[in-house]
A protein has these predicted regions:
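Terminal, low-structured helical/coil segments at or just beyond the last alpha-helical repeat
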Residues: 105-153
Length: 153
């Protein structure tokens, strides 16, 4: 039904599933996704939050909450949720460009560059601090760090 864009039908079916099992994270996430598709982002967040109470490491809920927050203009919060998802599953290729675009919207080009490279938020400050200390650009510092890491392996 999602593929057919019948989101109202998905909502009805998921409500039935949730009545049977209120901890069905698949149904909760599907509710949120369908609500997102219907531009009901605040409602969607409630379902992602419920999922995250049940499983704080549910990457689907983290990513979709980030999407909802982004649609609502809460870019920094969205970035933080993408970052949590990235810490749990660093193989997700859609996270770095999504974080980068949000940093661009916040007019933070250095962070946008680092996010696009897959750098976690917690590691950005060190790179920025090292660049300042070494009197070089963020780009140069990142490349220098990558070169050093490659040679140490």
């Amino acid at each position: 039904l999602e593929n057919l864009k019948q989101y109202d039908q998905v909502l009805k079916l998921c409500e039935k599933l949730i009545q049977i099992d209120p901890k069905d994270t698949w149904a909760l996430n599907s509710m949120g996704i369908s609500l997102n598709e219907l531009d009901r982002h605040k409602d969607a967040i409630l379902y992602y939050d419920t999922t995250l109470v049940i499983d704080p490491n549910d990457v689907t809920a983290l990513m979709n909450k980030a999407i909802s927050l982004s649609h609502l203009g809460n870019f920094q919060d969205a970035i933080n949720y993408y970052d949590l998802a990235q810490r749990i599953d660093s193989s997700l290729r859609e996270i770095p460009p999504a974080k980068s675009k949000l940093y661009e919207k916040l007019n933070m080009p250095d962070e946008a560059f680092l996010a696009a490279q897959g750098v976690l938020n917690k590691d950005m400050e060190k790179i920025k601090s090292d660049a300042k200390e070494n009197k070089c650009s963020i780009f140069h510092q990142f490349c220098d760090d990558e070169f050093k890491n490659t040679n140490s392996e």
